[in-house]
Amino acid sequence: MKSQKLPRCLAAAALLSLTTAIASAQAQTWPAKAVRIVVGFSAGGPTDVVARAFAEHAARALGQPVIVDNKPGANTILAAEAVASAPADGYTLLLAATNHTMIPALYSARVKFDAVRSFAPVCTLAVSPTVLVTGPAMPAKTLGAFMQQVRETPGQRSYGTPGTGSSGHFASEQFLRMTGLSMNHIPYKGAAQVVTDVIGGQLDSSFATLGSVLPQIQAGKLTALAVASSRRSTLLPQVPTFAEAGVKGYSADAWYGLLVPAGTPAPVLQALEKVAVQFTEQAGTVARLQGMGMEAQHTCGQAFGRDMDRDTRAYIKLAGELQLKAE
């Protein structure tokens, strides 16, 4: 019996060695064909725009076509599943956004992948700071005045979001828990009407991504009280961070970044990271993203992975406290 097992073990070891050698050789020659970037949103949105801008740069840098594949549906779960189950060879990428780390908090029973461990993080490409904006219904011009008015009228002031469980909802509730304030949540089906109603006075405030409200701020229709970043936005240098305004430790940037299937060879990850960093440092990229209220910014590899893991845990905890369920 032992004599039969030994050849089998040797054969298995030889097969594993051969498979590893083939994978290594393929990684060294990557890319030898077109690369696909899967996006969980329809064409035209911020995630899609970042993906297409990166695809143009990557195609030039890699010498191969880089194709954007829009796969909207199920709050980006369909796109994430497609990439998580794809071969870990560097030819299928996911352009993910902040909501990717919210999936476990809202859909853990429905998904077939782990939002963190089923993927290898490459780099973030851009961030869009979250900004607290108010309209005519809320005359406060500073974060301190806003907090004082909310404190004096507990439960009477409102904030709007694109929907229950959205990034705006999580950002708002994190702020309220940190400050001990109470406000009414008014969920909408999309961000556009939220902005319209803050401007019109039907809503007091909203925590919105800067890209979605920058034109209205610049036109004086909305007042920006603070940005939820570690430093001031280059697009709104006159607006303080929450820390500068007295709420330390609060951060709610919306990020856009590249993920690949877990197990992707290190040489491929290194090559992708190099291309991603080059992309964020190009003057053309910086200008293009600024035009959409975004900032080119890269956090790569393990640091990106740690940020994702931290955020995922925080969203799971907050969703439990709020008893949130996916709509």
Residue ranges with predicted function:
Residues A11-A21:
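Bacterial N-terminal signal peptides
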Residues Q26-V116, Q156, T164, G180-S205, ...:
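N-terminal (or domain-start) structured segment
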Residues A32-A34, R177-L181, A266-E327:
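An extracytoplasmic/periplasmic, membrane-proximal ligand-sensing/linker region
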Residues S42-G44, T98-N99, V127, G135-A140, ...:
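Short coil/turn segments
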Residues H100-S108, L176-M178, S205-V239:
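A ligand-binding cleft/hinge motif common to bilobed small-molecule-binding domains
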